[in-house]
């Protein structure tokens, strides 16, 4: 993994997670170009948690607009689109049981994470992938260092269903 997702420390205190995001597009002649090349900084959430919104779409299939969705005010997910984000969970992250009306791909990039479900708990390590299908869950970091995860959330039809 690139250094962009590493947690930066100054004097033993963790600083905001910074990620370089490169977005391609087309110029007026239809040639491929870089539209945005910028460093995005994480935003604090609940205690011991922060996230960086990397990209989002407001429809499926996606429309390749000229807008930069990093400026959008996103919630947990979008009703008809997709969200791509990085999240950092420090040890002892505040509990937050939740579910999304989306199909979520979660990738553990570094550290360890415990995913709590109604009936089970799963210990995840760097390289592990979770396919979250609208189930209620909670992320817990019982490790000794931060855990960084990437999430891709894709809107689903009909919301949450039992018996998948």
Where are the predicted features?
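Short, Lys/Arg-enriched N-terminal segments with co-localized hydrophobic residues
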Residues: 5-16
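N-terminal intrinsically disordered, low-complexity, charge/repeat-rich segments that act as generic
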Residues: 14-34
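Ligand-binding loop in jelly-roll beta-barrel domains
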Residues: 82, 114, 121-125, 134-159
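Residue-level marker of beta-strand positions
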Residues: 128-129
């Amino acid at each position: 993994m690139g250094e962009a997702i590493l947690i930066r420390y100054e004097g033993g205190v963790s600083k905001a997670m910074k990620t370089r995001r490169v977005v391609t597009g087309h110029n007026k002649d239809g040639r491929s170009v870089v539209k945005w090349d910028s460093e995005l900084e994480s935003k604090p959430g609940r205690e011991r948690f922060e996230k960086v919104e990397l990209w989002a779409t407001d429809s499926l299939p996606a429309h390749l607009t000229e807008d930069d969705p990093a400026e959008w005010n996103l919630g947990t997910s979008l009703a008809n689109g997709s969200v791509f984000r990085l999240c950092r969970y420090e040890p002892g992250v505040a509990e937050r049981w939740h579910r999304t009306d989306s199909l979520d791909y979660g990738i553990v990039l570094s550290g360890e994470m415990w995913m709590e479900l109604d009936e089970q708990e799963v210990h995840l390590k760097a390289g592990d992938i979770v396919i979250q299908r609208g189930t209620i869950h909670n992320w817990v970091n019982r490790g000794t260092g931060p855990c960084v995860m990437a999430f891709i959330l894709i809107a689903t039809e009909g919301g949450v269903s039992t018996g998948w």
